[in-house]
């Protein structure tokens, strides 16, 4: 399966579960440093803020759907636009890294 097909499936899966969300690919695949064992590191940016338990629910649901669709594991972070604004300025925070190196899908 080509990258463009995989990216489309990721976008569609996230959008069908969390409409209005944006998806960033970051990590080794965004940097072009992946190997055959690399997962997909994804930051899902939502318009609304979710509780921790809601994030777990949505992460699990989307993760399962993506494993079924692309047969490759994903590492999924879900944060609201407000949470992104707060976290992206924190040195060493994974959100800062994801925003800096992320590719919009």
Model-derived regions, located:
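Catalytic core of pol beta-like nucleotidyltransferases
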Residues: 1-22, 30-36, 47-105
């Amino acid at each position: 399966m080509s990258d463009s097909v995989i990216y489309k499936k990721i976008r569609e899966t996230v959008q069908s579960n969390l409409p209005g969300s944006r998806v960033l690919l970051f990590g080794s695949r965004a940097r072009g440093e992946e190997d055959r064992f690399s997962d997909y590191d994804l930051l899902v940016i939502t318009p609304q803020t979710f509780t921790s338990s809601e994030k777990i629910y949505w992460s699990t649901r989307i993760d399962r759907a993506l494993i079924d669709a692309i047969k490759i594991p994903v590492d999924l972070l879900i944060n609201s636009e407000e949470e992104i604004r707060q976290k992206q300025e924190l040195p060493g925070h994974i959100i800062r890294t994801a925003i800096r190196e992320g590719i919009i899908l």
